[in-house]
Amino acid sequence: MKVVDMHCDTVLRIYDEGGSLLENDFNIDLKKMLKGDYLLQNFAMFVNLNDSVAPLIKAQQLIDLYYNEINKHPDIIKPIFSYQDIIDNQNAGLMSAMLTLEEGAVVNHDLAILRNYYRLGVRMITLTWNYPNGIGYPNLSNANDHHDLFSINTKDGLTDFGIEYVKEMERLGIIIDVSHLSDAGFYDVLKYTTKPFVASHSNARGICGVGRNLSDDMIKELAKRNGVIGINFCGDFLKTIPNGNARSCIEDMVKHILYVKNLVGMDNV
């Protein structure tokens, strides 16, 4: 069975720690992907708004690193810009790489910059990380407080600019990713858009009640829109333990997969 992984931070790890996409000590490299029979890997360019490097600059640096690493191995993997590219790569015996952004605010409140990210090959954007960002709000109100994992924001959704932002994403053909977004923001995306969207790395709140996961109703609404939820392998989002820092294990991942399957079917997980 071919693997589609909707989110990884490998490019950031290489940026911070050095190393190669071909082979490294992280969770994802090309050799591991080949062994796992990957079809598609989404590579997230994660930018922390509190970083010392300006967000717009950091995003550009990460995108440059992404292409430099991918283009070293044209016999193994190629970047994709459309669904047809995935099919063409598979027929050619190649894996596919999709460029994504994790932090929508790297556009500096300017939709012209959003359009330029599309021209650079970005095909999915996670609207927020763990801070309010001018586009919307996360469920977390304090990214450094473990207990805040259970907070759920049903009040603060997309801003006026955020509504313009998601509409422009749809027009361009950039997939909207609602992982990290507040509950109110999720329902705003549902209200102001018409195409399928995704939660690239979220789990079922019915099993693990943290705010990063989706409620049953959210999963059902996502499925009605023909969207997809990508299971998150982070232990704290797989199961709840009193002191946090839950260990990630395959049994817990399977529980979430089966939970979503029983709720809406396998086509949406």
Describe every region a protein language model picked out.
Residues 1-152, 209-269:
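N-terminal hydrophobic targeting/anchoring segments and the immediately downstream early-domain regions
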Residues 127, 136-137, 144-221, 230-235:
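Active-site core of metal-dependent hydrolases
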